[in-house]
């Protein structure tokens, strides 16, 4: 019965805040509309210049092949390698292809010509992938038998057949939505009451710690369900992406992650005295959890010490499980490890949240 009145108090506080309801409604929509386009990690628009020292029909055919490729932005032909290198130094060009003199003659005589590919490696990923793309095109032009072998080789792409990067990224964005809605908002809640002095009135009442903590968590869990529904609708309406698996798993995983972030937020707010202190501490944890979760880079590519943190990072388990539901349509058996890990981490964090709240006086 006490919990009921505490929840009514929390809802009244949320409704009285003119900014908070707008944030709850607009943040998931804006994030799902903008971030899938911004966080596209496919390497495209690689600026390429060509130095053709042969000026033959075969060399021009290679130049046209490079210019027609959708991954490249052809910047024209340079008069010499030094001129092309100057464009690289000025960041106008990402890669240079130098076709040697006698390119066509070597091909006619059955020799393999030496074509130079120079890539700007300031952006290591773009330079490496760009040089790989160029090398594949040159090999196909120099060795026609390689193209014949490629035509005989058939590959079958499982699950994400269109190789749509948004299908890979959108499930992970649910975690960012939960991070704000159930992480930051509960963090600022108790600290705001401390600054206003209303928390002292609560401390002198016979309300138990569990009831008080639940009254702070439950409203944001319901907000998390609303945000999840909005994200699912945006993913369906704007991108045509729906979970291949049971949609109930999406809500279960979201609630598990929401429990962790809301508990973490309460731990921080119980230990903080000012709003500024709570925001900076929460920002520290959020950035580390996000960067080490595998959202932006594969966890297997991390150094060994950083990879060990993924075993205690709930966001890492959440992203793996959500991608399983959306892309592969997995069942509980395929997500058992992730779900159990989230439950264990949530239990520890929830216990810490309850124990961190102490009545003063």
Question: What residues fall within each predicted segment?
Answer:
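Transmembrane helix boundary and interhelical loop/hinge segments in multi-pass membrane proteins
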Residues: 14, 91, 183-205
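Membrane-interfacial helix-loop-helix junctions in multi-pass membrane proteins
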Residues: 82, 158-163, 242, 294-349, ...
